[in-house]
C-alpha cells in the first residue's frame, strides 16, 4: 500500500511543479495578482509537506 501512496504523492508533486512553472512563465510577462501569489505560496507549502511525507514513507520501508 505504501507504493500506491508514493505513486499518488509523485503524481501530485508533478502537477504542483507544473503549476509552479506556469506561475513563473506568467510572472515573466506581468506582475502576479495577490491571489496568484497566495496560490503559489500554498503550492510551495504543499510541495514541502509532500516531500516530508515521501521521506517518512521511504524511511518506513
Language-model regions: role of each:
Residues 1-14:
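Short, charge/polar-rich alpha-helical segments
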Residues 11, 15, 21-60:
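Short, charge-rich amphipathic interface segments used for partner binding and complex assembly
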Amino acid at each position: 500500500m505504501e507504493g500506491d501512496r508514493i505513486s499518488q504523492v509523485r503524481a501530485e508533486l508533478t502537477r504542483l511543479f507544473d503549476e509552479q512553472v506556469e506561475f513563473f512563465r506568467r510572472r515573466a510577462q506581468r506582475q502576479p495578482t495577490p491571489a496568484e501569489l497566495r496560490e503559489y505560496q500554498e503550492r510551495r507549502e504543499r510541495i514541502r509537506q509532500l516531500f516530508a511525507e515521501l521521506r517518512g514513507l521511504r524511511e518506513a520501508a
